[in-house]
Amino acid sequence: MNYQTFQPHPNLAALISCYWTLEVPASDHPDRQRIIPDGKIEMAFILGDNIKRYTSGQQFILQPRAFVLGQTLEPFYVEPTGSVNSFSVSFYPYGFANFADVPLKTLANKETPISDLFGEETARKLEQHIIEASNTQERITIVEKFLLNRLNQTTTVDTIVKSTIATLVATNGNTSISNILKKEPSKRRQLERKFAEKIGISPKQLGKVIRLQSALKILLNQEGENLTHIAYESNYYDQAHFIKDFKEFTGINPKDFLGHKNMELSSAFYK
């Protein structure tokens, strides 16, 4: 597996976490990989063979060749049909709203073809240019030109949304929304509405995902730590609360997470 990340143009750095590429040789017996929520939105281009996305049991669909994956609140499985070669743009929680004309709640928990978001002709040209590019740097240049042009035509995300996310990130999801709005409690409904439109999930849900991400980093980078310590470091009420949230978003308990064959891909994103 070859996973690499690349930094965005300074004018996009506040909206894009990174670009990343993934290359995996074809296998006669590929393992399904469990993808877990991370609070970000992805715009991905499949350059290699098709990838299955399991919907239930043995039922699957093929992921679109170019799509946006909205916010997710539960794990799902993917499986390559051959060799993997992907290029992706990873947006911060509020980042993609600056380029979209639809409420982001309509993108949650699914892959949406970019043609549905940018129009058939625009999407076709973008996808063709990405595929025909000879290397990753060329792809970054192409997608950045597209995004910078589109950014100029789109309104920005509200300050209340940005400040709420900044607080959640700064505290690893350990601040209640009531505490964030303690000086303006009447804005709770407004915030919920704006989150649905610009993020795709509620502020409380995003906070839970961010806190889980903090716990995952500790779990993966400090192997050997007991679960009580990880729960304490991540500010969960207790170990039971930590395990409950962990299973909700990953579908597996923390002890089984490390080294699990279905977690190889998700684990790579934390190294």
Annotated model-derived regions:
Residues M1-N172, S176-S178, K183-R188, S202, ...:
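Alpha-helical bundle regulatory/interaction domains
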Residues E197-I201, D245-F257:
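A secondary-structure capping/hinge motif
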Residues S176-I177, K194-K198:
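Extended amphipathic alpha-helical scaffolding segments in membrane-proximal extra-membrane regions
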Residues R189, R193, I201, Q205-N221, ...:
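Catalytic-pocket segment enriched in acidic/His residues
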Residues V209, K244, H260:
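Residue-level "edge-of-site" marker
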